Amino acid sequence: IENFRPGVLERAGLAPEVMHEWNPDLVIVRISGYGQTGPWSHKRAYDPVTQAATGYVAIQNNPDVPIPDLVRNALVDKATSHSAAQAITAGLLARERGELGQTIELSLIDSGLAFFWPDGMMKNTMVGEGVREGPALYDRYQLTETSDGHIVMWAGGDNEWHAVFRCLDRPELCDDERFATGAARVQNGEALANILHQEFKK
């Protein structure tokens, strides 16, 4: 496993093809910031910078403080390490099944984007006529303010939402056509948010 910037191994006479001449069964993983080739390949890569480049920063907007922000842990670094572990496992399996060694190229930008894409790009993936629209997952990732601090409140299906309404002593909301079903709650999200905000602050 190496994570030098592109070209360092080659200049040291340790290019993958050279090492495979010495040992054809080697599984070599090359981790870079932005790939072995391309306009950014020479740049240094740091987790916060790749968070910004892959979209994490853009969706960290807190409605109360509407500015972009970082995820405050080394998210992309860790996503890349998991991707590397999976890639190594695949390379070892290929070797076990009779293939020669492998050279696997992995970058922070690729791993970060792959980890971000499913929910981070939810609003831009299924679009057009006939597509059921709803809030992106990250729109719902918000703290709930109460009278003495903040909590994390999450409800999924109708039964959970109806339990929330009853806990707030608002059982009539269970039968309110605006909030009784998931589709209705999506259509009336702003009205529901206003009610919840008022009730949780009591």
Which residue ranges define each predicted feature?
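Conserved short-loop catalytic and cofactor-binding motifs
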Residues: G7, T37, V76, A180, ...
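Aromatic-enriched alpha-helical interface/lid elements that frame and gate functional surfaces
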Residues: D139-K202
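Rossmann-like NAD(P)-binding element
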Residues: E2-E10
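Charged, low-complexity surface patches
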Residues: V8, E133, F200-K202
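Active-site-adjacent "lid/gating" segments in soluble enzymes
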Residues: E10-I151, A155-G156, A163
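A generic structural signal for short
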Residues: F4, T80, E129, N194-E199
